Amino acid sequence: MRVLAAMSGGVDSAVAAARAVEAGHEVVGVHLALSAKPGTLRTGARGCCTIEDSHDARRAADILGIPFYVWDFAERFTEEVIETFVGEYAAGRTPNPCLTCNEKIKFEALLEKAMALGFDAVCTGHYARLTVEDGVPVLRRSRDEGKDQSYVLASLTAEQLGHSMFPLGDSLKSQVRQEAAERGLAVAKKPDSHDICFIPDGDTKKFLESKLGQKPGQLVDAETGAVLGEHTGVHGFTVGQRKGLGIDAPAPDGRPRYVLSLEPVSGTVKVGSADHLGVTEIDAKRPIWPSQRELDGPTECVVQVRAHGGTADAVAEVADGGMSIRLRRPLRGVAPGQAVVLYRPEEEGDLVLGSALIAATR
């Protein structure tokens, strides 16, 4: 097959490309330039998609003996990922930009261009597994549960999965680093990228304020209605947040306060004790079924509401064009705007049943 290997400049995508070459595919490497000012993104080990990363990807491609190109996706990344991220926070929701990037950039824009150029598949360094059931590709958790990325891939369609390759799905991260060293890849010891790539200093509040400005509002006690303080914008908060609330007076019972809800129109941020954070019901919208199989009535499953952690047994069913999910135990810090992913536990790796965006919780 003709395979386009997306090479970020990290160890995972380099080894994934190497395995595609070793499997006998005709492989071409590509690095996506996602910023109009890539030289300003790096701060220490944070960030990604910088000029330095582009050079690392090119060096890896040279060692593998494959052609290498840099494609400019900065404008589309800004429109599809950054502007969506800012808009969601302005609306009081908590988006996952990595999920949006996979859906709109790596497996929509990139895959479209790859298909137009005659490639059969796109290969990435994601930790996830693909198998085939009844002729349909299905997405599963990776062998390395600590590195599993099926959550941020769960919005892909069956058609997109059918043109995708995840060569690292059955490997542990330690094995990937060892293999990179054995192949002579300089990125073998390169630190993993963390945080949001377009906010390299990790200060999401400052970034959002630079885009949205200050929109003052009140911090209100959810139980008493008492005004506890003021803030500069609901975009500086997320449900479940404890630190950085800017409340000087301690709670009467001495317990920590958490963000319970955000009201973007009035600018009110309601806070309270952890007792009020537990969620047992989720209403979700825009469901996606990667295996093309919509739920048939109430379905036992495991749900995940964050990229790492936040899982619970649940019963989910299709309702009013979306999903209605009842959790077997309460989950904390479940915020509108997050993705909820449904899994079916299986020995060969938990299977992704579907995903949707959280609209409301109770």
From Swiss-Prot:
Query: Could you tell me which HAMAP family the record lists for this protein?
Result: tRNA_thiouridyl_MnmA
What name appears for this protein in its UniProt entry?
tRNA-specific 2-thiouridylase MnmA
Q: Which CDD domains match?
A: MnmA_TRMU-like (cd01998)
What's the EC number here?
2.8.1.13
| Predominant location category | cytoplasm
Which pairs of positions does the record mark as disulfide bonds?
Answer: 101-197
Q: What are the TM regions of this chain, as residue ranges?
A: none
- At the top of the EC hierarchy, this enzyme's class is transferase
Q: Which UniProt keywords apply?
A: ATP-binding, Cytoplasm, Disulfide bond, Nucleotide-binding, RNA-binding, Transferase, tRNA processing, tRNA-binding
**Residues covered by region (Interaction with tRNA):** 147-149
Cell compartments where the protein resides? Cytoplasm
Residues in the signal sequence: none
Annotated site (Interaction with tRNA):
126, 338
What this protein is reported to do is described as:
Catalyzes the 2-thiolation of uridine at the wobble position (U34) of tRNA, leading to the formation of s(2)U34.
Q: Which residues bind ATP?
A: 6-13, 32, 125
Write down the InterPro entries for this protein, in alphabetical order: MnmA-like (IPR004506), MnmA-like_C (IPR046885), MnmA-like_central (IPR046884), MnmA-like_central_sf (IPR023382), Rossmann-like_a/b/a_fold (IPR014729)
Which reaction does this enzyme catalyse, per its entry? S-sulfanyl-L-cysteinyl-[protein] + uridine(34) in tRNA + AH2 + ATP = 2-thiouridine(34) in tRNA + L-cysteinyl-[protein] + A + AMP + diphosphate + H(+)
